[in-house]
Amino acid sequence: MREMPKYVTGKKWRCMTAANWLHRQAMVASRFGHAAFDIFGVPIFGHEEDAADNFATYIMLQFGGAQARRLIGGAAWAWRAYLGDYRRNPVMQTRLAAFASDHGLPQERFYNLACLAFGANKSEFADVQSYLPPTRLPKCSYEYQTLVRAFRKEISPHIDQEMAKRVLDTDWLGSLESGPVPQK
């Protein structure tokens, strides 16, 4: 909350607070990804941080509909400041040290999240097209399906499917002020 502007009040403040909370939920889901990889011995090709981000994105998308949109939107919210308008200014300067981090650049994390969301449900996330470069859009369905196959093979066998259904059927975000509301 320290990074929130002090002058924002009212509805805009509530929206920003909710977005900040939703982004933090995505970060928690990413930590669960790291734990799952370790506990279940999931083999990782590439950066584990990218795989954990993908794990979190997959989990958020499983809620479907409005909950998935809010979760994905909250996760993307924190990276929005880094993006600007790539159409207006497609060239950016980055310090070389940023490429040495075990975490992807915020821009990369945003685009990966957006592409997976669009690949999961083109109609629900149709507005995401305007954020992704046209060269990335055709690959999004494939990227999401690759993630689905990996999750089903490496993670799903370890999940209590009945409990997962109860979790996914709960309206966790109906109101951020009140508690979760189980669906029947």
Predicted regions and their residues:
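Catalytic glutamate of the conserved HExxH
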Residues: 24-39, 54
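Active-site scaffold of zinc-dependent metalloenzymes
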Residues: 1-21, 32-37, 184
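Alpha-helical scaffolds flanking conserved acidic
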Residues: 18-26, 48-51, 73
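Acidic helix-start/capping segments at beta-turn-to-alpha-helix junctions
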Residues: 50-55, 68-86
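An active-site-proximal "capping" alpha-helix that borders the catalytic cofactor pocket
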Residues: 45-64
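Inter-helical turn/loop segments and adjacent helix faces that build the functional surface
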Residues: 39, 43-44, 66-67
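Fold-level signature of zinc-dependent metallopeptidase catalytic domains
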Residues: 67-79, 171-184
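Pan-zinc metallopeptidase signature
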Residues: 92-183
